[in-house]
């Protein structure tokens, strides 16, 4: 499938999970997903300047009764660790983190970034899942959202190039 078709499947999975509020930071590999989110009438979409501001925005939306997701690259996740710790983890705010896994297998440009992503997620005590197969999109996104709601914590889904349909 091409990136636009893959983006449609990912956004359908987000909708199926019951999420209605999505904050995003532009990223080259996630551009098709973000465009689909922007055009989805069932979402309140908030474009961001920095990823960590999305943590506070999603926390506020959750406290107002919304189900939230934050879309970013793993470099942005690393920038957001303090905000995640002092907001979502401390105050038990579930947010679905959809993170492009730069530096994963076959991604030559970001090997160092890829090597620290999972250890950083683990250090925060955030559960995470690596999404590599298109046929697991709905199950993984919906399951991660259920886990976030039940645990009252953020849950991360790492999106690989193969799932995004990008090179």
For the regions a language model picked out, list residue spans one by one.
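Thiamine diphosphate
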Residues: 1-167
């Amino acid at each position: 499938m091409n990136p636009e078709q893959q983006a449609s499947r990912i956004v359908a999975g987000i909708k199926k999970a019951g999420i209605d509020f999505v904050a995003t930071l532009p990223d080259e590999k996630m551009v098709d997903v973000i465009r689909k989110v922007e055009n989805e009438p069932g979402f309140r979409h908030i474009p961001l300047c920095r990823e960590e501001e999305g943590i506070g925005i999603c926390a506020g939306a959750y406290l107002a009764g919304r189900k939230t997701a934050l879309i970013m690259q793993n470099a942005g996740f690393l920038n957001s660790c303090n905000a995640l710790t002092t907001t979502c983890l401390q105050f038990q705010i579930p947010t679905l983190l959809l993170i492009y896994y730069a530096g994963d297998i076959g991604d030559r440009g970001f090997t160092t970034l890829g090597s620290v992503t999972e250890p950083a997620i683990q250090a925060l005590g955030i559960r995470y899942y690596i999404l590599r197969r298109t046929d697991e999109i709905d199950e993984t996104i919906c399951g991660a959202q259920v886990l976030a709601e039940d645990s009252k914590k953020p849950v991360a889904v790492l999106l690989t190039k193969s799932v995004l349909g990008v090179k």
